[in-house]
Amino acid sequence: LRTGFLDYAAKAYREQLRQDVWPFERFLAATVALGFLLEAGWLLLTLAFPDYIGDPLVVLLGFALILLLVAYFFMLPYLAYSEKGATIDKEMHLFITRMGVLAASEASRKEMFGILAGMREYGTLAKEIDKIFTLVSKWNVGLEKACRTVASQTPSELFSNFLLRLSHAVETGETAEEFFEKEQTVIMDQYEIRYDSAMRSVEIIKEVFVVLVVLVLMIMVLVTFMPFLVMESMGPWIAVTGGFMITLDLLIIYVLEAVVPGERIWHNMKMKTIVQKKITRKFQYSIVMCFIVTGIMIAIWPYLNYYLDLAIKQALFQPASVELQHPTYYIIPLLILSVGLTPLLWPGGYVMDQEADIKRRDGQYPAFIRSLGGSVGSRSKSFTLPLKKLRMHDFGPLKKNIDDLYKRLSVRIKTERAWEYFAAETQSELISKFNEMYVEGSKTGDTKKISKIISDNFIRINGMREQKYESGSNFLWMAYGVAITMSFLLFFGLYIVEQFMILFKDMSIPTEAVQQTGLFFFSFKESMASLPVLWTTSWVIIVIHCALSALMVKSITGGHRMSSAVHFVGMLWASTISAFVVMYAAQFLVV
């Protein structure tokens, strides 16, 4: 394993430098800029906390950051090379499907590579294919030798093995159709293994995330009790712990983006559909409503605070003249933000409904394309007559799209344009990509074979996606639990601090007695930050964490940005309710 890693690392440095794709000047400039930022941060820390800068632990931490920066600089070629390999692997299922379709349409191997080399949507994979096409067409290198040459240089092991098998098939005289028909199963099996491995990694990341969050929450609870143990203000420590929590969230998002298979639910075609225009319009209206609702909530803030306090007093059977030990105005801003952002549920809910329809269309598409391929193959190359019969069948949410496709073709709209409208209006990324392959291959090839290749691979990929949806659903409930727990622990800890402040605010203990007994909590009110600042810091941490948790769910499921807004608002409301429960329970305990 160690030898394999070292060999891959050596190959990464060699290929990056040979191809001149390691932009040394850019990386050096970025490193210098980051060094200046660290130096500026160090100076600010020196000015803000001069007593701590000379501490050996702080100095050691500074040197560790510098060493980490240097290590990152030298690791950049390896990281860039590995990222290219991962990008190629993520496109292999689409690549092999398209190759199978082109082979069924009786295109030569050279023509197939020429077509794929021009498809920039494949990114790094298209560049690797373009190398083969250039070697064959411009340098007159044999296809088998060109495949071996690129296989020795490509960062993807999956693609390298495929090229070696292709080279052997060319040498033995195996036809392109036979080879790519067998490769459908081989590549899809390997892709599925890697997909399952990635999803298992996601489960591990989720477990690590929960463990780290629990650890940070425990630290937050301990920090709230710091004034009772040492003569230190807990304000900076809560801010540092909250910053660590936010950094942890960002790191988890980065890791998920790198590990989770990169398919999206929604397509990214240039054509704007009615649904996309509705989403944009609803979002714009909801933003205006957010400002209006927030303005109203701020205007009624004093009345809101009064009536909430009154409601709690009535629930505790206390007269209105009794002063609450824990007034509600500390957490009113969190309530205002929750109410103010609630209008985002309107476009977000619409997006989630559309995503449910997209998933149902994805489930019906393989049956539709297989039926269409058989009908077209047995009649003619025209889609109109087969679609006329197929539109009578119930394909769920896909039925309307089939009807619209038939109507466009029947009025002599260009075939490619009609199918493009069909793919765009389904909103599905999978359908848009596989649909393009079907239309391209059906012009000259056997539509029955092509539809079988597409439907079989589509079913397998759609089945893999179900793992993502299930994992995202599980993580969503986990994120809600973390948000509720964080809100409860933070506000409960601050409530206890507040009660001790009230208890000891009139006490006067000599400093000598405090130092002799070690009871620093008698003087903590002089050393700690003001409570309003601590409350504000706490709910800011909660809001940022809820937003980042919603983005984590999006990273796993591949959904729309507006669907993450629904989860953000939901977690924000859950945190707000948790805060009010703490307040109510605290008043009950005091009474």
Residue ranges and their predicted role:
Residues 1-16, 96-116, 141-150, 157-197, ...:
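Hydrophobic alpha-helical segments characteristic of transmembrane helices
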Residues 1-51, 72, 76-82, 258-332, ...:
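Membrane-interfacial amphipathic helices
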Residues 126-127, 157, 161, 212-220, ...:
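Hydrophobic alpha-helical transmembrane segments in multi-pass membrane proteins
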Residues 56-151, 161, 283-287, 294-304, ...:
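Juxtamembrane/interface alpha-helical elements of multi-pass membrane proteins
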Residues 25-46, 63-71, 193-255, 289-300, ...:
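Bilayer-spanning, highly hydrophobic alpha-helical transmembrane segments
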